[in-house]
Amino acid sequence: MKKSLKALMLGCALGVLPTLAMAQEIAVIVKTTNSNYWQNVRKGAEAAIAGQSKYKMTFEGPASESAVADEVNMVDAAINRKVAGIILAPSDPSALVPAVKQAYDSGIPVVIIDSELSKAAAGDYQSFFSTDNCAAGKMAAQEMISLVGKQGKIAVMSYVPGVGSEIGRVGCFEKYIKSNSSLSIVGPYYSQSQMATALNQTTDVLAANPDLKGIFGANEPTVVGMARAIKQAGKSGQIVAIGFDGNEDEQNFIKDGTLDAIFVQGSYQMGDCLLYTSPSPR
């Protein structure tokens, strides 16, 4: 079976940073720092900010994507430090809204990345950048159908319910499957972006569904846990497995036949773009 790695590149528009007399802080706050994806965003942002003296960058995030309160506190702290701008990947579409509104009221420009905020925050941030997660979900669904056919049963292993990226990625995957095949879907199951949780969930799904033809993992830690469970169950190469993101573990699972395809975002390019999109203060 042909293995594949597909890239989902993020386009960006160049903005103009305000001219300041001394180095000012741009706070980059992501969903978690314990992820190869977000560390690549960090590397891209560091490369973008190197060689200039107007800005310094700080980079932080909670220990896990489910630690929403910690991320809210980080945004509040950045506001209290009177940073020049905030680049935020919200782990929850609603919980971060009050903090973003406070930043707006304080005259601090905010750029949202990766996952959208709820409509309640409309007008309180300057820009939004992300992978087209709906298009990515459709691409993954097309690949699944091409590999397993239009009949049978597949499972969906997701991460955090209600997050903007998850809604688009998993929602459009499921919608395309239902509209273009007769495949039945088991799940989605939510790992809370915890590898160990995904491993245990996938182990249970495989045991309860011996007739499963395919399985889709929707983000990096979920895919790694999913693939480890498949391998431990001795089902590598026996079940079609498609993942999202592309850290070293996932690439190795492609090589050994546990994963059949992964869809990779341009996380480094996202970070590289973002330092140029922080808008001027109001």
Give the positions of each predicted feature:
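Flexible loop/hinge segments that line or gate small-molecule binding clefts
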Residues: 93-135, 146, 153, 159, ...
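Bacterial N-terminal signal peptides that target proteins for export
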Residues: 1-9
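Conserved small/polar residues in nucleotide/adenosyl-binding loops
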Residues: 276-282
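Sec/Tat signal peptide C-region and signal peptidase I cleavage site
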Residues: 17-23
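Hydrophobic alpha-helical
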Residues: 79, 88-105, 173, 187, ...
